[in-house]
A protein has these predicted regions:
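Short, acidic/hydrophobic/Gly-rich beta-strand patch recurrent on exposed beta strands
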Residues: 62-67, 132-134, 261
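Solvent-exposed residues in well-ordered beta-strands and their adjoining turns
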Residues: 48-52, 68, 121, 134-136, ...
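Conserved loop-to-beta-strand segment in the C-terminal subdomain of adenylate-forming
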Residues: 126-130, 363-366
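Short edge beta-strands and adjacent turn/loop segments
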Residues: 112-125
Length: 374
């Protein structure tokens, strides 16, 4: 959507969310909450290595994004306007250093080659970056020398990782991850909470917009004894609720996320948030605990794009919280789940709804809905 004026992007997103929510009787009255600057908002870039035929018929290593409509061709980039400006020189230096090795890019068609992906995370508060280079196995000394040079040339790079992947799939996540220099994590802040990020930690793409969403959630959530934070990730929603609720329970399937969530609670002096590892639909089957000892006043859900598991919906209805806050990155899944929640017992009604432009220049949008029990 980069060829569409930002005001028009927001109108299109409002229309899309409105149409989906109207199917369950919800009106989106407020405009979509914009970003002050719809450019350079992303805190993470995942680039792909490829090969381009250069002048003189010499194959040149490229690093960038897949060409529109092509699975195989990678467009070489010097700069991405969705990423903070300090990331661009790091990309250029990494491309130069990788080319200097003479090693080829990985080819998905033949499953041959070496360089696969380049991941860069940027800290808004520290103005530093974490760099992770994903390759196939081998060339240990070459990679260590490469990162030694990178850390000398780019002082903004505060953390360096080497990921090794033998997967046939074209995904950035490696089977092995080795810390090669700098700090083990990237430090940043979301509202008043200090956080630490690893290469594959999940954080909303725009830290600025995430802060607005969490502030809005706290404003809507009131106070109470117990809150649930389902699909809690790094624990940020739970931390934001910790001042208003006596006890917060966070659930997530990713143990790495929960390890950082516990670290974040300790770093920020929060002692009333408890994190549990597992699938929400499985952990919540302990009805004696969740529906009696830990029965919530508030349940917050932030599920993946596919939405809520039917068992989670059933448990939410069985727990009868006074309020349910649903944060969604897929308004169609949101509407589907709301239909199930509205048709169950006890009866819930939507009392607040707001859409946030988390992803300018794309069609994606975040939607926050507050349900209250009749």
């Amino acid at each position: 959507m980069q060829d569409i004026a930002y005001a028009d992007q927001l109108r299109l997103k409002h229309q899309r969310v409105s149409q989906a929510l109207e199917t369950v009787g919800i009106e989106l009255a407020d405009p979509v909450v914009p970003l002050a600057d719809p450019w350079r908002y992303r805190n993470k870039a995942e680039l792909t290595f490829g090969t381009a035929r250069a002048l003189g018929a010499v194959d040149a290593l490229t690093v960038g994004y897949h060409e529109a409509g092509s699975y195989w061709r990678v467009v070489d980039i010097d700069e991405c306007l969705l990423m903070p400006a300090p990331v661009a020189p790091v990309v250029r230096t990494m491309r130069e250093l990788c080319r200097a090795t003479g090693l080829p890019a990985y080819r998905q068609k033949t499953h041959e080659g070496f360089f696969r992906h380049l991941l860069i995370r940027h800290s808004r508060t520290r103005q530093t970056s974490l760099v992770a280079l994903i390759t196939t196995p081998g060339n240990d000394a070459v990679i260590r020398n490469l990162f030694e040079t990178l850390l000398k040339r780019e002082p903004s790079v505060s953390s360096a990782y080497w990921g090794i992947s033998e997967s046939l799939a074209d995904v950035a996540y490696p089977q092995t991850l080795i810390h090669l220099g700098g700090s083990p994590s990237l430090e940043d802040r979301v509202n008043r909470f200090q956080i630490r990020l690893l290469p594959f930690s999940f954080l909303q793409p725009s830290t600025e917009q995430a802060e607005r969403i969490y502030q809005q959630l706290v404003e809507w959530s009131g106070t109470g004894a117990i809150a649930w934070d389902l699909y809690c990730g790094l624990g940020l929603i739970g931390l934001h609720l910790s001042e208003a609720y006596q006890k917060v329970y966070g659930i997530d399937v990713e143990s790495d996320h929960l390890s950082l969530a516990r670290t974040h609670a300790a770093m920020n002096g929060v002692s009333n948030v408890e994190f549990r590892a597992g699938k929400a639909e499985e952990l919540l089957q302990d009805r004696r605990f969740w529906l009696q000892e830990a029965r919530p006043n508030l349940a917050v859900v932030d599920p993946p794009r596919s939405g809520l598991h039917p068992q989670v919906i059933a448990t939410l209805l069985g727990a009868r919280p006074e309020r349910i806050a649903y944060l969604s990155c897929n308004v169609n899944s949101l509407a589907k789940d709301l239909k199930e929640l509205f048709s169950g017992f006890p009866r819930y009604r939507a009392t607040r709804v707001k859409a946030f432009d988390m992803f300018p220049q794309t069609h994606h949008v975040e939607t926050l809905v507050l349900l209250e029990r009749n």
